[in-house]
């Protein structure tokens, strides 16, 4: 190893990168009593939201609830800075309910910076980390140990553990059309040297791509001609801590759509993008495609929905969600003006793509420590994920396990059956993912169990055991548990009699008669009856917290689900050797996710067991495939039986 100068400073933990993963990692390690330093290229862009200024959404909100249940901060800050909140998938079952908050991005960043400044044991440093200090030979893997980092200007900082959370900054290059420049994101330099340092230690790196749409001036949009989308969930929050709740002035988003002119302009100029022009071939996020990808992949669609989302209360900037593009700047304004309501719009910032180096996460342990270098951890977009929520969850896990490594404690592994955090990490470290990973409810075979509302019941006891939950939060949690148990007991014992004044109204609304009497629990088990209906009919206490009422309702409605789900999982395990027909048309199986249909069609596994190892094919997909095979088997047996009966006549 090369000789290094004496360290300028020494810390227990160094976190490299000040995004959502880095902030959670640094705060977690510091709260566990470790002297921690967060290194970032720009202290004025802490926890910045360079793409969509929003937190939550399907599966992502569950992650945010889980991080909060473990003492993390993303949920608290989203609650404090929300300017619009909505519940997605509200008409479906609780497994896929999702809270989504439009946040004030500048306010969010300021709040995070203040939180970092006031966290004991945590120091902030603005510097570019370009190298890793290591003791021992990296070959064979696992023999080397991290001892610190080296910065661009030659300073060395010592540490027993280092967490890399560099986001899109490693070798980052932004593209607008065929023109490009070195940058981690618009206006900020890329990180130099760290990719080479990782390669010298024997790590494999690859390239991924993402992008962000243009920002337009709100004052130049005819919002009065567009459909408004106001907040509908001002009373719902990510955090389980009421002291974090805030209900400031809400702002509406607006909806427009692409037109035939939009599609034609894109088709005519596809060759001018870096991807379709063949200049770069990095994989972009499957579930957040550019508008060019939408037009190409969904050629049969005449129009695509576009959301106009405010970036904050004190800025006129509007984020054009669903309209990221790699087209040249000279075409982007013309393209924007094909959208209804934007005919006279002013473009404040052009859209761009960014491709960057990442560290395939199969090189990590489930603790997010690297397999090659002891004490070196990696989290966030560097691991190939996409999204602030995925990054925050990984940051918490990496910071936690870095602290435990230094303390001589066993790492914490999150099982996939107990959290979306565990599902995500299991997918990352066990599958050879070659495109940006986004958490989805369909990736979890346990999704009704892994709801947002019960994240505290699943994880807060663990957080308390690990030292991440203080006495006040622990008391809040236990008070909620007690209130829920009391409410469930009340619902199971209190009966509504047919002679009660509200009985006839309840019968009419539920569509079923009350024979003599019925417990409130059995009433809740009826389709379409909810705890809010009990409150409306004065059969439940309106002062009872919403989380308590809804939690009790869900527990009662879905009490038998766990057993049925476990039976399905066990059946999948037993069926791992089951042969798959060579001519199986996966594209025709509608219950499979789109990704699973594509991957299964391409690979054509011969057994169900082989299908379990295909990246992008989740346990939920395997269950759906197994059920489909069983259905086909029964249909075949029935046809054979009918044919046999006919022939015997």
From Swiss-Prot:
PANTHER family referenced in this protein's UniProt entry, alphabetically: GLUCOSE INHIBITED DIVISION PROTEIN A, PROTEIN MTO1 HOMOLOG, MITOCHONDRIAL
Named cofactor requirement(s): FAD
Keywords: Cytoplasm, FAD, Flavoprotein, NAD, tRNA processing
The family this protein is said to belong to: Belongs to the MnmG family.
Record's protein name: tRNA uridine 5-carboxymethylaminomethyl modification enzyme MnmG
Quaternary structure note: Homodimer. Heterotetramer of two MnmE and two MnmG subunits.
One of the GO biological process terms: tRNA wobble uridine modification
Locations listed in the record: Cytoplasm
Function recorded in the entry: NAD-binding protein involved in the addition of a carboxymethylaminomethyl (cmnm) group at the wobble position (U34) of certain tRNAs, forming tRNA-cmnm(5)s(2)U34.
Record GO terms (molecular function): flavin adenine dinucleotide binding
HAMAP family associated with the record: MnmG_GidA
Residues at which NAD(+) binds: 284-298
Gene: mnmG
Gene3D superfamilies for this protein: FAD/NAD(P)-binding domain, GidA associated domain, C-terminal subdomain, tRNA uridine 5-carboxymethylaminomethyl modification enzyme MnmG/GidA
Pfam families, alphabetized: GIDA (PF01134), GIDA_C_1st (PF21680), SAM_GIDA_C (PF13932)
Primary location group: cytoplasm
Residues binding FAD, per UniProt: 17-22
GO CC field: cytoplasm
